[in-house]
Amino acid sequence: MAQKRPACTLKPECVQQLLVCSQEAKKSAYCPYSHFPVGAALLTQEGRIFKGCNIENACYPLGICAERTAIQKAVSEGYKDFRAIAIASDMQDDFISPCGACRQVMREFGTNWPVYMTKPDGTYIVMTVQELLPSSFGPEDLQKTQ
């Protein structure tokens, strides 16, 4: 299947704002166990930005990633159409990449929207949700019958 470019192409100033917001969100991370703060900034179709950070728990499986925090905040306020998400960490040498669970949650809300994966110096790479999670299972698959 041919890959499509993101349905939403953001203006450079919008990308920059999203990157800054993801860095700001990282400052709120609660990560006393991993010491690995992550921030995310999610842009809705309406232009709102929802920030999220990772929140760990002594019962490790109960922690939540920054991306899912941002998405859950947006959905809980009635937003379900997303234009882009930016993710930030303190990794100097590598771009932060969403985990598999976050990729699946992002996919719930579409495949053709951009994910900006950053470094602290402001550089980034961008991929669509489809590129991050090819051949994925989504809501429309539940409607298929044999």
Curated annotation (Swiss-Prot):
Highly expressed in granulocytes while expression is very low in fibroblasts, chondrocytes, monocytes, and T- as well as B-cell lines. Zn(2+) binds at residues 65, 99, 102. The active site is at 67 (proton donor). The keyword Nuclease does not apply. Its EC number is 3.5.4.5. Residues 13-140 form the CMP/dCMP-type deaminase domain. Keywords: Hydrolase, Metal-binding, Zinc. One of its GO terms (molecular function) is zinc ion binding. GO terms for cellular component: cytosol; extracellular region; ficolin-1-rich granule lumen; secretory granule lumen; tertiary granule lumen. GO terms for biological process: cell surface receptor signaling pathway; cellular response to external biotic stimulus; cytidine deamination; cytosine metabolic process; negative regulation of cell growth; negative regulation of nucleotide metabolic process; pyrimidine-containing compound salvage; response to cycloheximide. Its cofactor is Zn(2+). InterPro entries: APOBEC/CMP_deaminase_Zn-bd (IPR016192), CMP_dCMP_dom (IPR002125), Cyt/Deoxycyt_deaminase (IPR050202), Cyt_deam_tetra (IPR006262), Cytidine_deaminase-like (IPR016193). CDD domains: cytidine_deaminase. PROSITE patterns: CYT_DCMP_DEAMINASES_1, CYT_DCMP_DEAMINASES_2. Transmembrane segments: none annotated. Substrate binds at residues 54-60. It catalyses: cytidine + H2O + H(+) = uridine + NH4(+); 2'-deoxycytidine + H2O + H(+) = 2'-deoxyuridine + NH4(+). It comes from the Eukaryota. Belongs to the cytidine and deoxycytidylate deaminase family. Homotetramer. This enzyme scavenges exogenous and endogenous cytidine and 2'-deoxycytidine for UMP synthesis. This is Cytidine deaminase. It comes from Homo sapiens. The gene is CDA.
